[in-house]
A protein has these predicted regions:
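N-terminal active-site beta-alpha-beta segment that forms phosphate/nucleotide-binding
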Residues: 1-77
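Conserved phosphate- and dinucleotide-binding cores of soluble alpha/beta proteins
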Residues: 3-7, 58-218
């Protein structure tokens, strides 16, 4: 069965490493903060000026003065700091954020990402995504495998305006975990109950498949 958004975030949380600085983009990535493995200390940074972001608050505990870049209410951990956007982007552009988790509309087999504009639709701008993809050493994309029309978002080449080139290292979707290699998308894991054939059918790029593909463990 395909994963839901929370399960995608739960799987991505398994990629987090102890004592690292992580930025979570808008959408599915913001859910990752709810699934930190035990024994792992992570400093979550939000580009609107938060370092030490915690999980989402319980209903009734929301503080309207504490929000993430997607305007969602958040919690902060002990020792958290708040600062202006100039300081936030100095952290990002200075490569002090080691991992960025972003949503996307398309990802290509060479690691290009398109996640800020659909032609013909009004948008306010690309936000901080271009700074993030140009600065982080490790970028993981969290998204659905196909769009609402059933068209694959895993492509040989992006068709939408590009946010960054050759930057994505791994993609986690509702169907699969994919690693981007020099030769294209390598299938690492499949969602529970989803077959390799179903993943291939939903992918508009060639897949590197080596041996038996394990199911994700959540």
């Amino acid at each position: 069965m395909a994963l839901d958004k929370n399960q995608i975030a739960q799987r991505i949380a398994q990629e987090l490493q102890h004592n690292t600085y992580v930025n979570l983009g808008i959408g599915i990535p913001t859910l990752v903060a709810n699934y930190i493995p035990k024994g792992i200390d992570i400093e979550f940074q939000s580009e609107n000026g938060v370092l030490g972001m915690g999980p989402f608050p319980f209903e009734g505990d929301e503080d309207p003065d504490l929000i993430n870049a997607g305007k969602q209410t958040i919690t902060t951990l002990s020792g958290a700091v708040l600062f202006d956007s100039a300081t936030s982007f100095a952290m990002i552009r200075g490569k002090h954020v080691q991992l960025t988790v972003l949503g996307a509309m398309e990802v290509s087999e060479n690691g290009d990402i398109a996640n800020w504009k659909i032609p013909g639709k009004m948008v306010k701008g690309m936000g901080g995504a271009m700074d993030l993809v140009a600065s982080a050493d490790n970028i993981i994309v969290a998204m659905m495998h196909t769009n609402r029309q059933g068209e694959s978002k895993i492509l040989k080449k992006c068709t939408l305006p590009i946010t960054g080139v050759n930057c994505v290292k791994k993609v986690v979707t509702n169907l699969a975990v994919l690693e981007i290699t020099q030769n294209g998308f390598k299938l690492l894991e499949k969602a529970p109950g989803v077959s390799v054939e179903e993943i291939k059918k939903a992918t508009a790029a060639d897949l590197i498949i080596e041996g038996e593909i394990p199911e994700m463990k959540l």
